[in-house]
Amino acid sequence: MNKTFNYSTMKVGIIGGGQLGKIMAQKAKKMGFHVTILDPTPNCPAAQVSDKQIIGGFHDPEKLAQLVNENDVTTFELEHVDTSILKKMFDEGKNIYPSPYLIELIQDKYKQKELLDKKGIPVPAYKKVDTKACLESFGFPVIQKARKGGYDGKGVILLKTKDDLSKAIEAESFIEELVDIQKEIAVMVARNIEGEISCYPVVEMLFDERVNICDIVIAPARIEESLRKEIEDISIKCIEALDGVGIFGVELFLTKD
């Protein structure tokens, strides 16, 4: 990946204009890219540091197509996007990374977990919820996760006992065994269209348990070197299994055993 590029004439479109989009846009501008943001909120955070904003929703095919057509490459701040028009344009040769087909897969946490499981990635025991009775398959306590739409702790619930079934998620979901966690770990993985891949430093996440949102990130993670290498290997295997192109955050549980 040690290559030099001239980005001075390249145009990048980013779907999503929140804080992550802003960070991405700031770095892109320093590298010389022309940056356009698609977001429904006028003067959103990312637009404040970019060259242009297209005001439109993430499910608006016309605005999505406009962004792709006006830029050399299009990428994503978030996965909650209508992929229909993007898949069509990707098939026509437009540079959209990660692939909208991968974004569509990532949108469904159950399908994502199923694929990683089939590729030999270690995952907690899980089961699709087809009926209320399925919620009791693993006993209690158990984790229930919405298949789609979850973020920042939303779409995830801990069912401690059978009495909690009245609070269960009504949308399409799956259950997952409750893991005895020592640490929550994350690593950013970058992979290009040639398949070259590299990892950022492994970090440790501390969560605010009241709202289940990451509150503190410790870099580098307080772990042994041998464990760091294993985490990197698993993370790389995940992105290769997805045939991902772009920068991905891989989150892992370090169990007590």
Mark where each language-model region is.
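Short, hinge-like loop/turn segments at secondary-structure boundaries
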Residues: 52-56, 92-93, 114-117, 142-143, ...
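A conserved helix-loop-beta module that forms one wall/lid of the active-site cleft
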Residues: 98-155, 162
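Internal nucleotide-binding/catalytic subdomain
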Residues: 155-256
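Structural detector of well-ordered beta-strand residues that form the stable sheet scaffold
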Residues: 36, 75, 96-97, 124, ...
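Short amphipathic alpha-helix with an adjacent loop that forms part of the alpha/beta core around
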Residues: 61-70, 133-138, 166
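ATP-binding N-terminal substructure of ATP-dependent carboxylate-amine bond-forming enzymes
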Residues: 1-102, 106-107
